């Protein structure tokens, strides 16, 4: 069986968790391959009696909620161990079996000095800040690239861990004390903080690349879920307003240890409108009642930070870009229900940059900052669509919206989200 990647095709918060969880019933492994606890996803589960449970996850793969599925944290993830066990304990208290979790021995670990540096750097930058979550993600990835990072496997050898922490703090404390006027971090406190997790962590840790490739050899299905999204990818996003990891289909391979030839399907997740958290360009952003409507009805507040998300109309230009960068085979269009009640729904089909039409995303970020959306206006609908389960169940104008977005976005739409619950989905094509 193949490996399948689920990728955010906008600026994040597209509903990847719900899509992953829906597919998780048909797969054997769900893998988080990038990022850390800087992004969150909410999964809503309704049991046979109609009782609804909402789960907010930040670090764990959403497959943790699917019985019989093995959730995996891959080598491309940076792990805050305190957050990891907070999430595991919270799920265990609600009756979720968390013993299935597997974690790569090569994943990097967020230390307290990484969190401190993240926060003080953002404050130091002031108006030039990136808009990070302050959770130490960027500094931990920087340590990884600089070859001074702490990996999960290091926590099981106190001597090696101490040597590594001593080496990294020689550098970090120079920055903390002499540039930011902060207190120096100590080797003893840092080592103690990390060693405290060793016994609980040990049974979960393995060579996850080997684990996943052996699963594929046995004919099992592996689902790779991205944190963040294409437009936040460190290489292909709106740099420098990006995350510090690879959030594209290419990153799915490097962050999991699965070779590219085994990745047969790439599912791009797009909202029926667009949102963004933090700084950076956003051509279709709304600053009026329409934007407030999307934010209120769509409950657009960050799972991780609680920050209000910036809201705007659907941008087919960035969807086409994401389809090209990732090789998207299928789109899942989420939150179509949020558009219910609007008289007309604009869709951005191109940009005007200095009087010149751009049908593709400008490679020059200055041009992208100055891009003015060119809209096509589609008729809205008033009917409640939350009970729709087939395309024919949708009102004619909602069907027309889905078809128009599909034609503009560069890949077929195979499913449409029409509500927050797990089963509130219109199936158009089989995803597996």
From Swiss-Prot:
Subcellular location: Cytoplasm
GO cellular component, one term: cytoplasm
PROSITE patterns in alphabetical order: ADENYLOSUCCIN_SYN_1, ADENYLOSUCCIN_SYN_2
Keywords of the record: Cytoplasm, GTP-binding, Ligase, Magnesium, Metal-binding, Nucleotide-binding, Purine biosynthesis
EC number: 6.3.4.4
GO biological process: 'de novo' AMP biosynthetic process; IMP metabolic process
One Pfam family cited in the UniProt record for this chain: Adenylsucc_synt
Residue numbers annotated as active site: 13, 41
Amino-acid positions noted as binding IMP in the UniProt annotation, renumbered to this chain: 13-16, 38-41, 133, 147, 228, 243, 307
Cofactor(s) the record lists: Mg(2+)
UniProt-listed InterPro entries: Adenylosuccin_syn_GTP-bd, Adenylosuccin_syn_Lys_AS, Adenylosuccinate_synth_dom1, Adenylosuccinate_synth_dom2, Adenylosuccinate_synth_dom3, Adenylosuccinate_synthetase, P-loop_NTPase
Catalytic activities: IMP + L-aspartate + GTP = N(6)-(1,2-dicarboxyethyl)-AMP + GDP + phosphate + 2 H(+)
Binding-site list for substrate: 303-309
Keyword Membrane attached: no
Cofactor: record remark: Binds 1 Mg(2+) ion per subunit.
MF term (GO), any: magnesium ion binding
Pathway per the UniProt entry: Purine metabolism; AMP biosynthesis via de novo pathway; AMP from IMP: step 1/2
UniProt-listed SMART domains: Adenylsucc_synt (SM00788)
Cited function: Plays an important role in the de novo pathway of purine nucleotide biosynthesis. Catalyzes the first committed step in the biosynthesis of AMP from IMP.
Subunit note: Homodimer.
Family per record: Belongs to the adenylosuccinate synthetase family.
Cross-referenced HAMAP family: Adenylosucc_synth
Protein's name according to its UniProt entry: Adenylosuccinate synthetase
């Amino acid at each position: 069986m193949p490996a399948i990647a689920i990728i955010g095709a906008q600026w994040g918060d597209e509903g990847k968790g719900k899509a992953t969880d829906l597919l998780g019933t048909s797969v054997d492994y769900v893998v988080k391959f990038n990022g850390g606890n800087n992004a969150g996803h909410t999964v809503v589960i309704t049991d046979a009696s109609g009782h609804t449970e909402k789960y907010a996850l930040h670090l764990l793969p959403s497959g943790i909620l699917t019985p019989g599925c093995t959730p995996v944290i891959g080598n491309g993830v940076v792990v805050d161990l305190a957050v990891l066990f907070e999430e595991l304990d919270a799920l265990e208290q609600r009756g979720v079996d968390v013993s299935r979790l597997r974690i790569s021995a090569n994943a990097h670990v967020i230390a307290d000095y990484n969190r401190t540096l993240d926060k003080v750097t953002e404050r130091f930058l002031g108006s030039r800040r990136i808009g990070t979550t302050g959770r130490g993600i960027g500094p931990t990835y920087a340590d990884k690239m600089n070859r001074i990072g702490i990996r999960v496997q290091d926590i099981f050898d106190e001597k090696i861990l101490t040597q590594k922490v001593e080496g990294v703090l020689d550098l970090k404390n120079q920055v903390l004390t002499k540039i930011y006027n902060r207190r120096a971090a100590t080797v003893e406190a840092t080592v103690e903080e990390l060693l405290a997790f060793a016994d609980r962590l040990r049974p979960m840790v393995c060579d996850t690349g080997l684990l996943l490739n052996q699963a594929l050899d046995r004919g099992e299905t592996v689902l790779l879920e991205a944190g963040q999204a294409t437009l936040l990818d460190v290489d292909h996003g709106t740099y420098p307003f990006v995350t510090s990891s690879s959030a594209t289909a290419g990153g799915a391979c490097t962050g999991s240890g699965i070779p590219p030839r085994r990745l047969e399907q790439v599912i791009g997740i797009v909202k029926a409108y667009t949102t963004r958290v933090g700084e950076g360009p956003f051509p279709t952003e709304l600053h009026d009642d329409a934007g407030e409507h999307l934010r209120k009805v769509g409950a657009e507040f960050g799972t991780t930070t609680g920050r209000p998300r910036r809201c705007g109309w659907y941008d087919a230009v960035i969807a086409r870009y994401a389809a090209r960068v990732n090789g998207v085979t299928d789109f899942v269009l989420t939150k179509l229900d949020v558009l219910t009640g609007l008289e007309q729904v604009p869709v951005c089909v191109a940009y005007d940059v200095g009087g010149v039409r751009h049908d593709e995303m400008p490679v020059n970020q200055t041009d992208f900052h100055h891009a003015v959306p060119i809209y096509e206006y589609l008729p809205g609908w008033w009917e409640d669509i939350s009970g729709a389960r087939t395309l024919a169940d949708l009102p004619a104008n909602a069907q027309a919206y889905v078809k128009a977005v599909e034609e503009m976005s560069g890949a077929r739409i195979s499913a449409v989200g029409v509500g927050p619950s797990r089963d509130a989905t219109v199936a158009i094509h089989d995803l597996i």
